[in-house]
Amino acid sequence: MSIQDIVETYSTKWYVVVLVALIVYKVFDFFYARYLMYKLGAKPFLQSQTDGYLGFRVPFELMGKKSEGTLIDFTYQRTLELDNPDIPTFTFPIFSVLIISTLEPDNIKAILATQFNDFSLGTRHSHFAPLLGDGIFTLDGAGWKHSRSMLRPQFAREQVSHVKLLEPHMQVFFKHIRKHHGQTFDIQELFFRLTVDSATEFLFGESVESLRDESIGMLNDALDFDGKAGFADAFNYSQNYLASRALMQQMYWILNGKKFKECNAKVHKFADYYVEKALELTPDQLEKQDGYVFLYELVKQTRDRQVLRDQLLNILVAGRDTTAGLLSFVFFELARTPRVANKLREEIEDKFGLGQDARVEEISFESLKSCEYLKAVLNECLRLYPSVPQNFRVATRNTTLPRGGGKDGLSPVLVRKGQTVMYSVYAAHRNKQIYGEDALEFRPERWFEPETKKLGWAFLPFNGGPRICLGQQFALTEASYVTVRLLQEFSHLTMDPNTEYSPKKMSHLTMSLFDGANIQMY
């Protein structure tokens, strides 16, 4: 058969052309990657994982684990199943695209700080924009810098130190606990209501008062506008949906259902109500407002409705969810660890008194910071249960990470432009090389040991680098105040000894307990 006959025979076989083109592309890409490694001083990855299906099974497997409450521990377990778990940087495919996963502190430091400009949020804006728009958590570059400069003054010490604003909400919270008369109840559900009440008061100038309901003989007349109904449920649904979109990476657009759009609209209507109220105020009226209101301060900087709504919703996610999740894990662990609860109660008694002798007026931003064991308890919960357990960045250029390559795994590895790097704070915080053989145990005393004074990038409860959480002091102050007040007010804290441990975790944009924190408190 002549060459002309071969060409005529196969010229109409389009799939042959596609196959040849694919082979040529793969060969070229292989050698180009080798060239980049040589140019940047990188070595091949020591370890990789595959599902045998070019990564098409992975995202659906992850979403299945998410719906079961086992996603976080499943991804952590994958790092333990590496041929060499001591070199915790590897690749795995999602939809045939290689993803890099790491929990190596030097690599995380590079991503978040020393090579900050080499990485961006990638597709996060597309994942989250339907709910959160253009806010500090969804933007990169100049937009992010502008958002941060706008929001930073709102988290100055004088704003985060106003703990007395929490006390009216705590009094309602106590009523909910007492109505159970020592029986088991889910305190996590109450924490989410408490933090949305306090967050909306801080952000909007008035609380949604979600804790006030008929079960404790209190009517909620705070929400008297159209758009109030179902706000919390809509917010929860949309956040859960966003987490699923993030797991799909570049295929996020598959998840864009009708209910998701309806819930986003409800949340936006809720925020728009407060934005319009604030915009109706004149500059003189804004200056004369009593107390501090986050929204009013933003209105002094911009009158753009979209900007105001987006920034408020971004901060509401952080202000409500991170603190509620942290408090839930704190009381879950205190209830199952009486030794720690008793030791913490002793410190609180010494500092502020208990029960009828409680000196609530002495609880302040400054006095809370002097509670060393309380600080250790919070740190230990943030170590075992970081609010954002997993995150990712996307390379903006061809670059490297310091560890994971070569025969010993200690050489730099190549990160291609557009490649996703996932990092697990949850797994890094459980690294036995760093935290010892008891790394999986809840032991606050470790925070008084010399080793924990020099953790650096091995402890990242609030992220790190230029994008470190602006509201970390706000969250810690609120969590500290609530913990102190609850232990002052109630002397008994227990849990069913048959409660599953380690608990299942809910993974939305932040982490919480999948089955709630079911305790007895009286």
From Swiss-Prot:
Its EC number is 1.14.14.-. Its cofactor is heme. This is Cytochrome P450 52A2. Together with an NADPH cytochrome P450 the enzyme system catalyzes the terminal hydroxylation as the first step in the assimilation of alkanes and fatty acids. Preferentially hydroxylates hexadecane. It is found in: Membrane. GO terms for molecular function: heme binding; iron ion binding; oxidoreductase activity, acting on paired donors, with incorporation or reduction of molecular oxygen, reduced flavin or flavoprotein as one donor, and incorporation of one atom of oxygen. InterPro entries: Cyt_P450, Cyt_P450_CS, Cyt_P450_E_CYP52_ascomycetes, Cyt_P450_E_CYP52_fungi, Cyt_P450_E_grp-II, Cyt_P450_sf. The chain crosses the membrane at residues 14-33. The keyword Heme applies. Induction: By various alkanes. Belongs to the cytochrome P450 family. It comes from the Eukaryota.
